[in-house]
C-alpha cells in the first residue's frame, strides 16, 4: 500500500494532479446545494425538557420570545404629536411584515375606562394625529396605569417602546432583516435601539460569520507570510495553499451534497459551523508543512527530487494517515453532541480531513516531483534561522529531561486547578464589546426600558379562582422584587384593572375580586365592548392554563440559574402547593442547552482521547505508544481550559469547540514525533542520540506548523468577545500542543527509551 502511494506521485504525477483536481471539482459541485442557515433556533435540540415545554407554550399562547424596539430623541418628550404619528405609521407597517404576529405599543394597545359601572374598551391612541388635549388625556391615563406606562414608555419619558411578537416558527434572521428595513424607512430622524433574545438570535449569526470570515482571510495571509519566511520559497507556499483550498472546496461540496441527498438540517451551515473552515485550514496546513519540510531535508542529502519525494512519503505516510484517522475519529465523536448541527459538523469536517490527507500524500508530492528544484538554492540547501533555533531549543530540552518534566507537570497541575474556576456564560449581551452598537443598545434597553430579556411562568390552575389569582399576584410581586425584573404581566393584572375601572377608577379596587361570580362578571362586561381574544396571549380559552411573563434586564447565565433556583424555592411554599407552575422561555432553554453542549464537549474530549490512544496503540503495536501519544493532547486540553478558568474566559457554545482544534492539531504533532522516534529506535537501537535526531527531524515542522497557525490570532481583533477569546486560546493551543510535544513527550521518550527498546524487541544491555 505504501508503495502504491509513492508510485502515484513519482511515476504518474500529472495523472495524480489531474485526477485530484477533477475529483475535487466533482465533489465541489455540491456547493450549489450548500445552504447557510442564520436562524439560530434551528440549532436548538427539540427533545430536551425545557424545549418541549417551551414549544407547548408557544402552541398554546403563540410566540413568547419578543423583540424590543426603543426609539426617540434624547431629552425630548416622546408624547408629542409628531412622534405619536410616526409610531402610528410604524406600528402598522410592522404589522404588515410577513412573520409578525403582533405589535405591542401605545398605538396598538387598548384602554379600559369606567362608564356608569360598565367597562368601556377603546384604543389607547384613537387617531394618528393627536392634539394637545388628546395627548394630555393619554398622558393622564398612563400616569394612572403604571404597568402600561412601563411597558410602552421609557423611564425618562423620551423614548417609546415597541414589542414585536413573531409568529411561531418565524425565521428570526429573516424577520430581523425585514424589521430593520421598515425601521430604517420610518425612524431615520430618531435614535433607535433593539433588544430581546429573539432579536439577538436573528442578528448575531450573520454578524459573527461575516466578522470571522474577514479575520480568517487576514489570518490566512499571515499564515502564508510565516510559511514564506520559513520556506524562503514562493512555490512551496503556493503548494500548501493549493492543498488547503482544494480541501476546503471538497468539504463545502460534501456538505452541500449531504444536505441535498439527506435533507437533514444537520448539514445546514449555521453559527456553530463558523469554526469549520478554520479547523480544516489548520489541519490541511499541518499536513502540507510536514511534507514540504521533510522534502527539503531529504533534498539536502540526496539532491534528487524523485528520491527525496519517495523518501519523504515513505517516512510520512503512516504518521499523516494516523493523524487523519485519529482526528476523524475525534470529530465523529460529535455524535454524542445534543445538537443535530454538530453531527453534520463532525461528518463534514471529517470528509475534509480525509481529502486533505489524500491531497498531502498524492497531490502535493506530485507537484513536488514536477517542479524543477535547484538543490543549491538557499531554501533547499541551508536550514533557516527558525530551523536552527528549534535545534538549539531541542538540545536544551534533551540535556535537562527531569527539569523539563517536573516543570511541565507543575504547569499542567496549575491548569488542572484552574478548571474548577471555569465560568459558563451564554448571555448574548456578553458576546459584544462595550463599544459595540448592539451592546450599547442592549445597555440602553436595560437601563431605560423594560429590559432585553424575558422569562415565562406557565401556570396550570383554575384561573377564575380568586385564591389562585391572588397566589399569582404574590408570585408576580416576588418576581418584581428581584432587581433584574422590571415588569411582570399576567391575567391577574387584567382582572385587577377591570375591577378598578368598574368601581369608578378607584385605585383602592385594583385588587382581585373576592368571588368567582364577580370575576366572571368582569369578563362579561369586557366582552360587551372589547374582544375576549385580547387575552389569548395570557390565558387559554378554558381559563385552565395561563402565562405570567416577566420583563428583565440582561443577567449572566449564573444569575439566571440563581434566579430560577430562588423562584423554584419560593414556589415550594405550602400556599402554592395546588399550583402547577413551570418556569420556561428562551433563557431556560439556553441554560439547559449550554449545560448539554459543555457536557457533550467533555464527553467528546474524553472519548476522542481514548479512541486516539487505542488507534495509536494498535498501529504502533503496543498500548504504551498509545498512552504516550495522548500525553501532549491531554496536557494541552487541561492547560487551555484551566487557563480559561484562571483568566476569567467564559466557556460557551463557541469556546467549547476549541477542544476540536486542540485535538486536531495536538495529535498530529505527537504522532509525527513518536513515529520518527520509533523509526530511529528500530533502526539504530540505543546507539547514537535518538532524541536529538528526532528533534532535528520533527521539531522544525512542529514549530513551523504551530507558528503559521498562530496567524489565526487575527481573531483577537474580532468585534465579538467569544471570537476574541477563541483567537487568544487558539494561539495558546498552538503553543501548548507544540511545547507539550517537544518537552513533555520528548523527555518521556528519552527517559523511557530503554523500556521502549525492549517493547520493540531490541536487546538492552
Briefly describe each language-model feature range.
Residues 279-300, 320, 327, 362, ...:
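Short helical (or helix-break) motifs at transmembrane helix termini and adjacent helical loops
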Residues 55, 59, 128-233, 473, ...:
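Extracytoplasmic
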Residues 1-38, 365-366, 370, 379-428, ...:
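Signature of alpha-helical transmembrane segments and their immediate interfacial
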Amino acid at each position: 500500500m505504501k508503495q502504491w502511494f509513492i508510485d502515484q506521485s513519482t511515476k504518474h504525477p500529472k495523472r495524480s494532479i489531474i485526477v485530484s483536481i477533477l475529483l475535487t471539482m466533482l465533489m465541489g459541485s455540491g456547493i450549489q446545494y450548500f445552504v447557510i442557515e442564520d436562524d439560530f433556533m434551528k440549532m436548538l435540540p427539540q427533545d430536551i425538557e425545557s424545549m418541549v415545554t417551551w414549544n407547548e407554550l408557544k402552541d398554546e399562547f403563540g410566540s413568547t420570545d419578543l423583540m424590543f424596539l426603543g426609539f426617540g430623541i434624547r431629552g425630548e418628550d416622546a408624547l408629542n404629536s409628531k412622534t405619536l404619528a410616526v409610531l402610528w405609521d410604524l406600528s402598522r407597517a410592522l404589522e404588515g411584515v410577513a412573520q409578525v404576529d403582533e405589535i405591542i405599543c401605545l398605538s396598538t394597545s387598548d384602554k379600559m375606562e369606567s362608564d356608569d359601572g360598565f367597562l368601556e374598551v377603546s384604543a389607547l391612541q384613537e387617531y394618528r394625529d393627536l392634539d394637545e388635549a388628546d395627548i394630555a388625556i393619554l398622558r393622564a391615563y398612563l400616569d394612572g396605569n403604571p404597568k402600561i406606562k412601563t411597558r410602552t414608555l421609557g423611564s425618562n419619558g423620551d423614548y417609546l417602546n415597541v414589542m414585536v411578537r413573531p409568529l411561531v416558527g418565524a425565521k428570526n434572521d429573516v424577520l430581523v432583516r425585514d424589521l430593520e428595513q421598515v425601521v430604517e424607512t420610518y425612524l431615520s430622524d430618531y435614535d433607535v435601539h433593539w433588544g430581546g433574545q429573539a432579536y439577538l438570535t436573528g442578528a448575531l449569526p450573520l454578524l459573527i460569520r461575516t466578522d470571522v470570515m474577514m479575520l480568517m482571510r487576514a489570518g490566512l495571509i499571515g499564515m502564508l507570510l510565516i510559511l514564506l519566511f520559513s520556506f524562503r520559497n514562493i512555490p512551496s507556499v503556493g503548494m500548501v495553499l493549493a492543498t488547503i483550498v482544494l480541501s476546503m472546496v471538497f468539504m463545502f461540496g460534501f456538505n452541500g451534497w449531504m444536505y441535498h441527498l439527506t435533507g437533514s438540517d444537520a448539514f445546514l451551515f449555521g453559527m456553530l459551523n463558523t469554526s469549520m473552515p478554520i479547523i480544516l485550514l489548520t489541519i490541511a496546513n499541518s499536513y502540507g508543512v510536514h511534507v514540504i519540510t521533510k522534502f527539503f531535508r531529504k533534498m539536502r542529502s540526496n539532491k534528487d527530487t524523485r528520491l527525496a519525494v519517495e523518501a519523504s512519503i515513505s517516512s510520512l505516510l503512516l504518521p499523516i494517515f494516523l493523524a487523519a484517522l485519529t482526528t476523524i475519529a475525534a470529530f465523529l465523536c460529535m455524535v454524542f453532541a445534543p445538537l443535530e448541527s454538530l453531527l453534520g459538523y463532525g461528518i463534514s469536517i471529517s470528509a475534509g480531513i480525509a481529502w486533505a490527507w489524500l491531497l498531502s500524500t498524492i497531490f502535493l508530492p506530485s507537484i513536488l516531483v514536477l517542479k524543477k528544484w535547484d538543490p543549491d538554492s538557499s531554501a533547499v540547501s541551508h536550514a533557516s534561522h527558525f530551523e536552527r533555533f528549534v535545534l538549539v531549543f531541542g538540545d536544551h530540552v534533551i540535556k535537562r529531561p527531569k527539569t523539563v518534566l517536573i516543570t511541565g507537570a507543575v504547569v499542567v497541575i496549575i491548569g488542572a486547578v484552574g478548571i474548577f474556576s471555569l465560568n459558563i456564560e451564554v448571555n448574548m449581551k456578553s458576546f459584544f464589546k462595550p463599544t459595540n452598537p448592539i451592546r450599547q443598545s442592549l445597555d440602553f434597553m436595560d437601563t431605560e426600558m423594560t429590559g432585553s430579556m424575558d422569562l415565562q411562568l406557565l401556570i396550570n390552575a383554575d384561573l377564575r379562582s380568586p385564591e389562585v389569582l391572588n397566589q399569582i399576584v404574590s408570585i408576580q410581586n416576588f418576581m418584581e422584587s428581584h432587581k433584574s425584573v422590571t415588569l411582570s404581566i399576567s391575567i391577574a393584572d387584567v382582572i385587577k384593572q377591570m375591577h378598578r375601572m368598574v368601581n369608578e377608577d378607584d385605585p383602592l379596587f385594583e385588587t382581585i375580586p373576592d368571588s368567582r361570580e364577580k370575576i366572571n362578571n368582569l369578563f362579561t362586561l369586557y366582552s360587551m365592548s372589547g374582544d375576549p381574544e385580547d387575552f389569548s396571549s395570557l390565558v387559554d380559552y378554558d381559563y385552565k392554563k395561563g402565562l405570567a411573563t416577566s420583563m428583565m434586564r440582561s443577567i449572566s447565565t449564573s444569575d439566571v440559574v440563581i434566579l430560577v433556583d430562588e423562584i423554584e424555592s419560593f414556589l415550594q411554599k405550602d400556599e402554592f402547593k395546588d399550583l402547577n407552575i413551570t418556569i420556561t422561555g428562551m433563557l431556560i432553554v439556553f441554560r439547559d442547552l449550554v449545560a448539554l453542549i459543555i457536557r457533550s464537549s467533555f464527553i467528546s474530549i474524553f472519548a476522542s482521547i481514548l479512541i486516539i490512544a487505542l488507534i495509536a496503540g494498535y498501529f504502533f503495536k503496543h498500548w504504551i505508544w498509545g498512552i504516550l501519544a495522548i500525553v501532549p493532547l491531554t496536557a494541552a486540553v487541561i492547560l487551555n481550559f484551566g487557563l480559561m478558568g484562571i483568566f476569567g474566559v467564559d466557556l460557551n457554545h463557541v469556546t467549547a469547540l476549541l477542544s476540536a482544534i486542540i485535538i486536531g492539531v495536538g495529535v498530529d504533532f505527537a504522532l509525527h514525533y513518536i513515529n520518527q522516534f520509533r523509526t530511529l529506535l528500530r533502526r539504530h537501537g540505543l546507539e547514537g542520540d535518538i532524541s536529538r535526531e528526532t528533534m532535528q527531524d520533527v521539531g522544525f515542522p512542529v514549530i513551523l506548523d504551530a507558528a503559521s497557525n498562530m496567524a489565526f490570532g487575527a481573531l483577537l481583533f474580532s468585534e465579538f468577545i467569544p471570537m476574541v477569546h477563541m483567537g487568544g486560546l487558539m494561539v495558546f493551543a498552538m503553543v501548548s500542543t507544540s511545547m507539550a510535544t517537544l518537552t513533555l513527550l520528548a523527555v518521556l521518550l528519552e527517559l523511557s527509551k530503554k523500556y521502549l527498546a525492549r517493547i520493540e524487541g531490541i536487546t538492552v544491555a
